[in-house]
Every structure is written in structure tokens, then in C-alpha cells.
Amino acid sequence: MDIPPLAGKIAALSLSALPVSYALNHVSALSHPLWVALMSALILGLLFVAVYSLSHGEVSYDPLYAVFAVFAFTSVVDLIIALQEDSYVVGFMEFYTKEGEPYLRTAHGVFICYWDGTVHYLLYLAMAGAICRRKRYRNFGLYWLGSFAMSILVFLTGNILGKYSSEIRPAFFLTIPYLLVPCWAGMKVFSQPRALTRCTANMVQEEQRKGLLQRPADLALVIYLILAGFFTLFRGLVVLDCPTDACFVYIYQYEPYLRDPVAYPKVQMLMYMFYVLPFCGLAAYALTFPGCSWLPDWALVFAGGIGQAQFSHMGASMHLRTPFTYRVPEDTWGCFFVCNLLYALGPHLLAYRCLQWPAFFHQPPPSDPLALHKKQH
């Protein structure tokens, strides 16, 4: 997978978030939630106009360029918020976390800001750079799509269902377009042609003739997917208040964060159970039986989603903003960390396997009628 150069123009534009946020933080009129929402919408609108004016050719070639440019700006804002909440910087975004979206001050909110300000930011620059040079960015787009969708679905649902539901301000409604963007962007990314592979028909036939036992790496991934599926189901039952002793011990001694009334961990586990659990079963099937050409794409999507989710979940479980009673106990910290780290790494190994050795997932080549006729006679 080729890594496209980063978009310098968008990088420079996104860094304007630093002086803008600092200046707005000292405007006394922004102490009212409605003014915060209106000013935020105005800034994003002006930013979109600026991007369209400065990069009309790129936007005409691929409208997602404008989306990536605006989101790169918001990623820098999110990184500022995370650094501010952890007391690394001061005087930038206090007005927004107080009057705009106070739930960003939770441990979960801090870590999704860290992820958005680092991983998503680099993805935006890479994808925008690819558009500038008329190159493909399909694989980066699929990973971003999964990560972005998981982040926004868990965060918005947790805001509505958790203890911060009474703290929803007008700025919350600015996130509604964030629900629509993944749908549109997903269709655009999936419609892009796949990168060409060097798999010949003979290579595909040879690879697809091998059984699962002849492919030890795939066998290991299937075993992982089965174990991950059981772990996903178990944690889903835990947050659904399953009365068994195993669930009781786990939620109190291993992951008490699942009881946190902010609701983000509960929503996250249910997302895993309803979406990741079926994917584990389907992926295990695709690694066993050849010709499942859908797996490489969806492996990237789920790798992005699970990577983002596990980063936020693990970080929030140990962060000081999480009440002490809901943090991971010291005596079970090692078990918690290893299990959750493996849960995050597995989908990335699956995606890497699918991208590097895709022959097994290609559609079987059509049989040669002439060769078949000679064989029969």
C-alpha cells in the first residue's frame, strides 16, 4: 500500500485553529451556549469557503477534499481540547468545553479528542495529499471510515443516554452532519477502484487449493476471531447485567469502568456485540472458504473502528478523570491491558494479511473451456 505525501496546504490551514481558538477563548460574548454554537458554525462555514476558493481544482476533482480540509481543522481543535483537559496547555478552548460540549471533559471525550487530533489528522493530510496528486487513497479512506463512524456513534449515543444527557447544548446539533458525512464518504470511498494486485490466475488457484491447516497464519487468525467473538459476547452480556458469577466478578474486579454512568463503555460493548461479533464469524468463514472478495475492504473498516474504540476505552478506563471506583484495579491491570491490547491488534493483523496476500480472497478464475474439453477427451 503506497503512502501518499501529506497535503501541506491543508496542514498550514488547519494550524490556524491555534490562534483562532486562543482569540475566541478571550471573547466574553462566548459565555452563552447559543453564541458558542453560532460562532462555531460560522467558523466552519468560512473555513469551507476558504478551502473551496484556494483549492477549487481539488474540490472539483473530489469533493471529499473539502471535507478532509475542514475535518483537519477540527482535529487540531480536538487535540487542543485534549491537551487542555490534561493541563498541558491553557487559555485556548475553555469556553467550548464549558458552554459548548461539556461532555468532552470526560475521560472518554479526552481520548477521542487525542485520537482525532493524531490518527485522524494524519489520515486527512494523507488522503488530501493523494487527491492533490490524483492518486488513490481507498485503503486509508476505509480505515478512516470505520474509525470515524465508531467514534461518532458511540460518543453521540453515550451523550444522549448517559449522565450528561441534561448537559446537551445547542453546539450538540453541529454534530448531526457528522452522522451524514460517513454515509456519503463511505459511498465515495467504496466506489473507488481497488488497487491492482499482481496475483495471476495460477497464483489464485494454487492459494485457494490449500486447506486451512496448510495456512498456519490464517488458522491462527481464525482461532483469534473465535476467541474474540466469545470475549465480545461475554462483555456484551456483562453490560446487560447478566446475573452469572463470572459476569459479576469481571465487572467488579477487571473492568469496573463498564459500570460508569457516563454510558460510553456500555454503548461501546453493545456496538461490539451487535456489529463486531457478526463480523468475527463472517471473517472466520472468509478465511476458511476461498473467494470472499469482500473481506479485505471490511477488514480495514473494522480495524479502524476497533482501533479507535479500544484506544478510547483503554485510556478512559485508567484516566484520572474516571472516578476511582470505576478505574481498573491495580492487581488486575495486567490482565485487562493484555486482553484489550490483543483485541485491538487482531483486526489490524487481519487487515494486513488481506492486503499483503489477497490471492485467497479473489474470485476463482473461470475455467478454460478448451482445456476442459481436452481433459474430457
UniProtKB/Swiss-Prot annotation:
Residues 61-186, 217-351 form the EXPERA domain. Its main location: endoplasmic reticulum. The chain crosses the membrane at residues 10-30, 34-54, 63-83, 111-131, 140-160, 170-190, 219-239, 269-289, 332-352. Substantial expression in liver and intestine, whereas all other tissues analyzed show low levels. GO terms for biological process: lipid homeostasis; lipid metabolic process; regulation of lipid metabolic process. It is a multi-pass membrane protein. Keywords: Endoplasmic reticulum, Lipid metabolism, Membrane, Repeat, Transmembrane, Transmembrane helix. It is found in: Endoplasmic reticulum membrane; Endoplasmic reticulum-Golgi intermediate compartment membrane. The keyword Ribonucleoprotein does not apply. Pfam families: EBP (PF05241). GO terms for molecular function: identical protein binding. GO terms for cellular component: endoplasmic reticulum membrane; endoplasmic reticulum-Golgi intermediate compartment membrane. It comes from the Eukaryota. Regulator of liver fat metabolism influencing triglyceride secretion and hepatic lipid droplet content. May function as sterol isomerase. Belongs to the TM6SF family. This is Transmembrane 6 superfamily member 2. It comes from Homo sapiens (Human).
